[in-house]
Amino acid sequence: MRLPREIGPIHFVGIGGIGMSGIAEVLCNLGYTVQGSDASESANVSRLREKGIQIHVGHKADNVAGADVLVVSTAIKRDNPELLAARAQRIPVVRRAEMLAELMRLKSCVAIAGTHGKTTTTSMVAALLDAGDFDPTVINGGIINAYGTNARLGAGDWMVVEADESDGTFLKLPADVAIVTNVDPEHLDHFKTFDAVQDAFRNFVENVPFYGFAVMCIDHPVVQALVGKIEDRRIITYGENPQADARLLELKPSGSGSTFKVAFRDRKAGTAHEIAELMLPMPGRHNALNATAAIAVAHELGLSDDTIRKALAAFGGVRRRFTKTGDWNGVTIIDDYGHHPVEIAAVLKAARQSTDGRVIAVVQPHRFTRLQSLFEEFCTCFNDADSVIVADVYPAGEAPIQGIDRDHFVLGLRAHGHRNVIPLQDSASLAGVVAGVAKSGDYVVCLGAGNITQWAYALPGELKALGG
């Protein structure tokens, strides 16, 4: 039995969230009656309203009146008035991943998981399948620039989804093709131990049916170890590793992107194939690896080399992934979602490869618990930055932790050898600080999962307003 067409209204609590909004949009496009609520107005809320979805700002028990089902994310607390009202009225309550799983049952699915790179890789798989006339349905964790949204309903038989591992519910997703980009210690508030994280990813891959396959990056030692433990599923490995089935070769920076080729090796058939002259309009080894995963899926699903080549060269990127927000006196301003040390290091390395000038990082640490648990890693991931400007921690609903704040982070960076670390008093001070440091040819990279994205978009205008 599949999701009945007559069910509805489907009420989303926190409908403006990036994961929730995509599912709501696809359900609406399928003809279901969708409604919801969110704590505040946002671009996602406005976009969904334009599609005719009724959205309340604020959470109230009355909002769920008439709903057939309530969809909640793990961010919704047990005492939320809408959740309490739904349970009191015996309205079924489902998690975001469960509703996503219901949508996935309608199609053949590619699900992209990993600690980092999910959103970009999901966008790349979607772009390649789109170019191959698959017309896929897509539900992503970020705004795909080519669509102007994070979701679209396609008429084809395939769906491409980002699989969020943060609360373990990605194990509910019925994927025919699974991608694992990497596995690092993250979301330990849910998993408790890194061993539990690894077990979850192993289960994610082993959930793939016997007729499907998984694409896994063996440049990452934890993923390589997982590959060795999975015996009864078809695995296509990728990476720069000489043992990879889809091997990234001859990676070179090229303008604001990179060029490379991918060599395929079919161990069972004993054959080899190479796709040369690939160009990706995004810098960084991490993005080339993400592209290699997408290329491996596209190649396996029968796309021609030329289609892959053209689609990759035309890839428009994802909002908040090395996004240029403007420039000032020859200084380029970049906005990036990177908030984990591995992501930050990769983004700064990409910036270093993209300019002959200096790299100035502006970081807004995201969550006190993350800064605490990965403090040493945070103090060593800025090596490709000439200067680091440190803002206050974005709490994301967390209570402060004594000794885990901006000033201690500044001291930690300095203790690890960083020569120019600047504490930022507030966002209004940013333009003045940047103007005093940056010169023509420099890249200013704003990093974080909080509201620093708003600073990044405002910064070019604020710098111009200062004159000079």
From Swiss-Prot:
Its EC number is 6.3.2.8. Pathway: Cell wall biogenesis; peptidoglycan biosynthesis. Pfam families: Mur_ligase (PF01225), Mur_ligase_C (PF02875), Mur_ligase_M (PF08245). Keywords: ATP-binding, Cell cycle, Cell division, Cell shape, Cell wall biogenesis/degradation, Cytoplasm, Ligase, Nucleotide-binding, Peptidoglycan synthesis. It catalyses: UDP-N-acetyl-alpha-D-muramate + L-alanine + ATP = UDP-N-acetyl-alpha-D-muramoyl-L-alanine + ADP + phosphate + H(+). It comes from the Bacteria. GO terms for molecular function: ATP binding; UDP-N-acetylmuramate-L-alanine ligase activity. The keyword Chloroplast does not apply. ATP binds at residues 114-120. The keyword Hydrolase does not apply. It is found in: Cytoplasm. GO terms for biological process: cell division; cell wall organization; peptidoglycan biosynthetic process; regulation of cell shape. GO terms for cellular component: cytoplasm. Cell wall formation. Belongs to the MurCDEF family. This is UDP-N-acetylmuramate--L-alanine ligase. It comes from Rhodopseudomonas palustris (strain HaA2). The lineage of its organism: Bacteria, Pseudomonadati, Pseudomonadota, Alphaproteobacteria, Hyphomicrobiales. The gene is murC.
